[in-house]
Amino acid sequence: MNPRRKKRLLVIVAVLFGIGASIGLVLYALQENINLFYTPSELVDGKGPNKEKPQIGQKLRIGGMVVPGSVERNEQSLKVSFTLVDTGPTVVVRYQGILPDLFREGQGIVAQGVLVEPNVIEAFEVLAKHDEEYMPAEVAEALKGIKHEKPKYNLDSGN
């Protein structure tokens, strides 16, 4: 092989190696930010035709309705746990922080967090509906057939 071909081959190999390394680094960086959406049924039973379940420690988002009577608050801290349901199994969500003002039992929410047990999510963000009619598209699709409960307000002041 003459020196000119050898130099050209070396440049081509270096460029291909650089492109491969760049693609690998981009995919690695994106892997850290991927969090898939699940419903409680998909989380417990598996998602898709292969019934794939998320791994313990995986970041994910879960959407469902807060089961009435399931919200438990710790009096000494901001820790809260509640149960989510769609049309089947329930999932427990644990959260430490101030819940959104619109968070209520019987309402749809989306929680973002980490799977710590097969049916327990340690959430770092909880999103509630914006108004009576709004529901994220993912949650609306997942919760077809569930009766939505409007919050009950006592407007009679008794005076």
Curated annotation (Swiss-Prot):
Asked if the keyword Metal-binding belongs to this entry, the reply reads yes
The answer on whether this UniProt entry bears the keyword Iron reads: yes
What single Pfam family name could you report for this chain, choosing any that match?
Answer: CcmE
| Segments on the Periplasmic face | 30-159
Q: Which UniProt keywords apply?
A: Cell inner membrane, Cell membrane, Cytochrome c-type biogenesis, Heme, Iron, Membrane, Metal-binding, Signal-anchor, Transmembrane, Transmembrane helix
GO molecular function, a single term: metal ion binding
- Tell me the HAMAP family matching this sequence: CcmE
Task: From the Swiss-Prot or TrEMBL record, give the protein name.
Answer: Cytochrome c-type biogenesis protein CcmE
Q: Give the species this sequence originates from.
A: Pseudoalteromonas translucida (strain TAC 125)
Write the gene name.
Answer: ccmE
